[in-house]
Amino acid sequence: SDMAVLVKMNMRDGFRGGMELDETMQVARRLEQSGAHALVLSGGFVSKAPMYVMRGEMPIRSMTHYMTCWWLKYGVRMVGKWMIPSVPFKEAYFLEDALKFRAALKIPLVYVGGLVSRDKIDEVLDDGFEAVQMARALLNEPGFVNRMRAEENARCNCRHSNYCIARMYSIEMACHQHLKAVSYTHLTLPTSDL
């Protein structure tokens, strides 16, 4: 059949006891030998190390707004900043590890992790990655790909505040920069922690 098989895999899990590069490189080699068409290189484990995946700030108040269990909501509001510390955003934050996979494998690789500018995307592609995957940049600016075609120095305006992540398992995933307080019958959803 003409179906492409892409496997999204962690390079590191981002927490003590999780998988590290030496283990995941073995997995990648096995997937390459097994005939996968491409690997999408990611990292992190949302329930154990959420900021390893997301980077930036964690909007605790907005995140807890969607929790239905009252005691969990208030507990996370009280100690959440210590439970889920912020990790500074750096564009292409998985690139250093991904380059090790690029050097060791022949299989096509898709880079994912903090791409918000055409300059960095061009750099990643020049480093030998066959494709890139974006999420928050496109959530922030759905027309970003078209703007990159028109502007050499295009950069999206994502602020890495992660309000979109706080909304992810609720009514809709959306960039808070484009929302006003949205009312759904009796419910008003926060658009920021300020």
List each model region and its residues.
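Hydrophobic faces of well-ordered beta-strands that scaffold small-molecule active sites
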Residues: 5-7, 39-41, 109-112, 132-134
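Glycine-rich beta-to-alpha transition loops that act as phosphate-gripper elements at the mouths
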Residues: 8-12, 108-119
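Glycine-rich phosphate-binding active-site loops on the catalytic face of alpha/beta enzymes
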Residues: 128-147
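Short cysteine clusters
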Residues: 158-164, 175
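Catalytic cores of alpha/beta
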Residues: 116-128
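Alpha/beta enzyme core
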Residues: 1-95, 104
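Glycine-enriched alpha-helix->loop->beta-strand junction motifs that scaffold or abut catalytic
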Residues: 34-36, 105-107, 126-132
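Conserved small/polar residues in nucleotide/adenosyl-binding loops
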Residues: 185-191
